[in-house]
A protein has these predicted regions:
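Small-residue (G/A/S/T)-rich helix-start motifs and N-terminal tracts that mark the onset
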Residues: 1-115, 119-141, 146-280
C-alpha cells in the first residue's frame, strides 16, 4: 500500500493534487461534513469544497478556513471535483433525497457515499426493486458500518457481523460498487475482484462519533490524488485510505506517552504519516 503514496513532484499544484467536494450537514448534524473536510485536507486534497447548510458555515470557517463554501439547497449545483463525498450528516428528508438523486442521476464521476446517503440508497433499492439513481460512467465507493450494511442488505447488524466477508461481497454485487465495510479489520471489496483487503491496523480508541466522517474525507482525497497522479483505481484508493487512517491512529495511541485519540488529533496524525510517505 505504500506504493499508493507516490512522492509528490515539485511542480504539483492544488488542482493536480486532487479536488474534493463534500455534500452533507443538516440542522441536527452541523459538524459531520466539516470533519470529512478535515480528513480530506489531512489526506492531501489540493482543494476542499463544502456544500453545507448555513448552520455549518461558522464551523467551516473556524475549523477549515481553507475550504470553500456553497450553500446547500435541493437545487444547488455543487462545485465540480475529482471526487464528491456525500451523506455525512445529510439527513434522510425529502430534500436530502432530491439532492442526492439529482447528483447521482445527473452526472458522471467519482462518488463516495456514506452515512445518510447509504440509507437513502437502501430505500431506493427497496422501493424500486433494484432500480438505482446511478448514471453510466459513475464510479462509487460505499462506506457502511454494520448498521448501514444491514440496511443495504435488508437484514440485521448481527447478520452482518456473523459473516462480514459474505456481507461485503453481497453489497458489492447488489450495488455494483466498491465497498468499505467498517469495523474491526475493515474490509474492502470491489466488483470483478476475488480478493478482499482486510486491514490489520486499528484500535478500539477509534470507536468515537465522527471517525467515519473523517475516513470518508480521507478516502475522497486519496481517490482524487490517485485519479490525477496514477490510475485512479477505486479499490486501491479505498484500501490505502483505510490503512492510512488506522495506521495513523495506531501511531497516536501507541506513542510514549499515548496521544489523545480525538478526531482533530487523528487528522493531524494522518497528515503527518501521509507527508512522511509522500516525501520519501
Amino acid at each position: 500500500l505504500v506504493a499508493a503514496f507516490p512522492k509528490r513532484p515539485m511542480d504539483l499544484h492544488k488542482y493536480s493534487a486532487g479536488t474534493v467536494t463534500i455534500v452533507g450537514g443538516s440542522s441536527h448534524f452541523i459538524h459531520a461534513p466539516v470533519i470529512a473536510g478535515l480528513g480530506a485536507r489531512a489526506a492531501g486534497a489540493g482543494l476542499v469544497q463544502l456544500v453545507v447548510p448555513d448552520a455549518s458555515r461558522l464551523a467551516t470557517g473556524m475549523l477549515l478556513p481553507e475550504a470553500t463554501f456553497t450553500k446547500q439547497t435541493p437545487a444547488c449545483v455543487p462545485p465540480r471535483a475529482d471526487v464528491t463525498a456525500i451523506g455525512m450528516g445529510l439527513g434522510t428528508s425529502q430534500n436530502s433525497e432530491l439532492l442526492l438523486s439529482r447528483l447521482l442521476s445527473g452526472s458522471t464521476g467519482r462518488f463516495v457515499l456514506d452515512a445518510d446517503a447509504l440509507s437513502l440508497l437502501a430505500n431506493w433499492y427497496a422501493r424500486k426493486t433494484g432500480a438505482l439513481p446511478i448514471s453510466e460512467g459513475q464510479s462509487l465507493i460505499l462506506t457502511p458500518h454494520a448498521g448501514e450494511a444491514a440496511r443495504l442488505l435488508a437484514c440485521t447488524p448481527d447478520d452482518i457481523q456473523r459473516d462480514r466477508l459474505g456481507a461485503v461481497r453481497r453489497i458489492v454485487a447488489r450495488y455494483r460498487s466498491v465497498v468499505v465495510l467498517k469495523g474491526p479489520h475493515t474490509l474492502v471489496a470491489a466488483p470483478g475482484r476475488d480478493d478482499v483487503f482486510s486491514c490489520e491496523a486499528g484500535n478500539p480508541f477509534m470507536a468515537v462519533g465522527g471517525m467515519g466522517d473523517l475516513l470518508s474525507g480521507i478516502l475522497a482525497a486519496r481517490w482524487a490524488y490517485l485519479a490525477k497522479n496514477a490510475d485512479g483505481d477505486p479499490f486501491t484508493a479505498a484500501a490505502s485510505a483505510v490503512w492510512l487512517h488506522a495506521t495513523a491512529s495506531d501511531a497516536l495511541v501507541n506513542a510514549n506517552p499515548p496521544g489523545d485519540p480525538s478526531i482533530a488529533n487523528t487528522a493531524h496524525a494522518v497528515a503527518s504519516l501521509r507527508v512522511a510517505l509522500e516525501r520519501s
